[in-house]
Amino acid sequence: MKVHMIGVGGAGMSGIAEVLARRGHEVTGSDLKESPYTRRLAAAGVKVYIGHEARQVGDAEVVVISTAIPKTNPELLEARRRSIPVIPRAEALARILAEGRGIAVAGTHGKTTTTSMIAHSLRALGENPTALVGGELNDIGSNVIFGREDLIVAEADESDRSILRLHPQAAVITNIEYDHPDFYASLEEVVETFARFVAGLPPEGHLVLCADDPRCRRLAELAPCPVTTYGLSGGELRARVLSPGSYLLFEGARKRGEVSLGVYGRHNVLNSLAAAGIARWLGHDPLEAARTLGSFGGVRRRFQLKGERSGVRVVDDYAHHPTEIMAILDVARATAAPEGRIIAVFQPHRYSRTRKLYREFGRAFGRADAVVVTEVYGAGEMPQPGVSGKLVVDAICETSDRPEVYYVPDQEALPEVLRMISGPRDTVITLGAGDISRAGEELLARL
């Protein structure tokens, strides 16, 4: 089949394009700008156009669009004019999952790392799955793992309810919190989306979910299939944390053994338990599955060490929600040099999220010694009156355990500010889903 993909340069779309091309489809794509993903697609034999023009649709039999594509896109308009079937990214993913035993990883936080851990563990156990991940695995430098066509692991996106298009055989739900205020008016709406997703699982399928999350626990009652629970405080698979990167695994009441991970943090302990739960569903020993993650190299922009110079450690993370930020700052603290400070550099992501969650952001940064806030990364949203990085700064200043706070709206000024306020033994961590990571890279160049 001839497939044209509009907005092919993102992590989700590029992965689907690679899988379709590998499976014999003739794939073309377009995006506004060149990126590592478009370059890799081109190297894989996919024709990628930079920019959007009607003629680039060619003789496609189906057109796939990403959620970022406006209705006025010339290629989309051309496909509509010619009555070429147009499907969203989630539908293309659903069709791939339907070709075999599909495993979808969902949740507000931790989807990318958990998907990667499942793929890593199943590969080590000899299952050889195909995996579509929303980020780049450090071990292979790609967001796609090619393996069996009848076993597929994929990240499921709840941000616009497109998760409801997926009908996997098994699913993981890591946690449920309020996010994506550009689409959901309340937490209840988010919960309802996950509930509908769970209700759609087949009776012969399986659900793995976090018992530490009360909203996840409620979903277990709705599942039409067997359920495996995991957690730190309860669940069939339970962990007792021993250090930032190790824990004792319990299966039911039985102590199984110690596990060491290749990544740090209580959140990654939970992610690894989810991976062990999926492996157990496939007939593997959960302890053996968890222990394979000792060689897990992590995911790009997930507590990624960018370098160390003049005694200053620079780390980058994708965290852009208050809960994620708290978890990452805890890891930074646990792995910091003695007496070293934690300097957080935050780029708020989306005006809608900043407006809804600025108070929660303020409380989250109480774990840092200093916070530098820059301007909001709009991610396609129009600016909103009164919504800027200053909103987060003011919220931090209102907290009782407030750190030093700096408001630097000009991102170009960040590296020099960071050079001036950081010193030996300090950890500087850039946080956000936009382009904040380059501030850390430029800081390293100046130290």
From Swiss-Prot:
Keyword terms of this UniProt record: ATP-binding, Cell cycle, Cell division, Cell shape, Cell wall biogenesis/degradation, Cytoplasm, Ligase, Nucleotide-binding, Peptidoglycan synthesis
Pfam families in alphabetical order: Mur_ligase, Mur_ligase_C, Mur_ligase_M
Gene3D superfamilies associated with the record: Mur ligase, C-terminal domain (3.90.190.20), Mur-like, catalytic domain (3.40.1190.10), NAD(P)-binding Rossmann-like Domain (3.40.50.720)
Enzyme's top EC category: ligase
Binding residue positions for ATP: 107-113
Pathway: Cell wall biogenesis; peptidoglycan biosynthesis
Source organism of the structure: Rubrobacter xylanophilus (strain DSM 9941 / JCM 11954 / NBRC 16129 / PRD-1)
The protein's name: UDP-N-acetylmuramate--L-alanine ligase
GO terms for cellular component: cytoplasm
Predominant location category: cytoplasm
Gene symbol of the encoding locus: murC
EC number: 6.3.2.8
UniProt GO MF annotations: ATP binding; UDP-N-acetylmuramate-L-alanine ligase activity
Function: Cell wall formation.
Reaction equations catalysed: UDP-N-acetyl-alpha-D-muramate + L-alanine + ATP = UDP-N-acetyl-alpha-D-muramoyl-L-alanine + ADP + phosphate + H(+)
Subcellular location: Cytoplasm
A GO biological process held by the record: peptidoglycan biosynthetic process
Protein family membership: Belongs to the MurCDEF family.
